[in-house]
């Protein structure tokens, strides 16, 4: 299975409970995994941190009809002792920000939020970006290493890190719709088991693991 890196903890915990098969997981940015499928890599299941990439692969004949199986929340993550209290604080001069690259869902969601800000506030925040990362793990890494003052990640990512980071919520009108979607890859070696695992993302051990990790229901 190829899955967005933000699902690492949840899927690592539930995969061993899948009956009848040894589930091997590969985590990376959703866009990178989609590119691999387009280049001929054939995992049995593909799960992305948005609904757009699975829909594209389905349209290209590379993925079964996608199923929405979880939701998440885009937030600002900052070090525990940070003075950042709001989205507007990120526009201050001297701030060092880490965000997702434009092609990865977390980066796309971030730019969607910034595009909704009034005046030049979004541009001023983007001017403080020092790092465009390929996945949420890269953003969290910059924060925990002290290389960034703030970053846009998913709520579940901050929960995994523990007390070293805290969450700054986005204003409700700006929150993007973060929906996770998955499908069975055309040409999968184990299509029946792949569909069974896919079902388990919405009702089963993996659905329970996702809920425990803080993901919402679709």
Regions found by a protein language model. Give the residues of each.
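Exported/periplasmic ABC-transporter solute-binding proteins
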Residues: 1-17, 31, 35-39, 48-51, ...
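A short beta-strand-loop structural module common to alpha/beta enzyme folds
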Residues: 22-31
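Active-site surface patch of divalent metal-dependent phosphodiester/phosphate bond hydrolases
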Residues: 62
